[in-house]
């Protein structure tokens, strides 16, 4: 996954930056918009995967402890209720995307949400803590 999909996003970022620079030099506005869109897509894929890699463990995982466990209990009622809500977010994605557990720094609480495709437009003030890749290749 790392050497294929994530590497393709990094290459896509580099290619889009080069093509964007060329399009700007030529005042080719159609190409500018296309390459800005491509840059956003590939940069989103890179960012999402970079967060996801940090969520993985060779030994699997278990229920969190400490402050995170307390925050999950406060926000969702229990770890099992969080798992049910997070699973619903993941399984409810239409098409490709990501399920996310994030810390809302403005509201001082945890929440779950979905990112579609490779969007990296996480809501303002949200810090992603856990992301699950729900693309068909995952």
Curated annotation (Swiss-Prot):
Transmembrane segments: none
Pfam families recorded: Sod_Fe_C (PF02777), Sod_Fe_N (PF00081)
Cofactor requirement: Mn(2+)
Cofactor binding mode and count: Binds 1 Mn(2+) ion per subunit.
Record-listed Mn(2+) binding positions: 1, 49, 133, 137
Reaction equations catalysed: 2 superoxide + 2 H(+) = H2O2 + O2
Keywords tagged on the record: Manganese, Metal-binding, Oxidoreductase
Class of enzymatic activity (EC top level): oxidoreductase
GO molecular function: metal ion binding; superoxide dismutase activity
Enzyme Commission code: 1.15.1.1
Function: Destroys superoxide anion radicals which are normally produced within the cells and which are toxic to biological systems.
PANTHER family named among the record's database cross-references: SUPEROXIDE DISMUTASE 2, SUPEROXIDE DISMUTASE [MN], MITOCHONDRIAL
Family the entry assigns: Belongs to the iron/manganese superoxide dismutase family.
Protein name from the UniProt record: Superoxide dismutase [Mn]
Species per Swiss-Prot/TrEMBL record: Mycobacterium malmoense
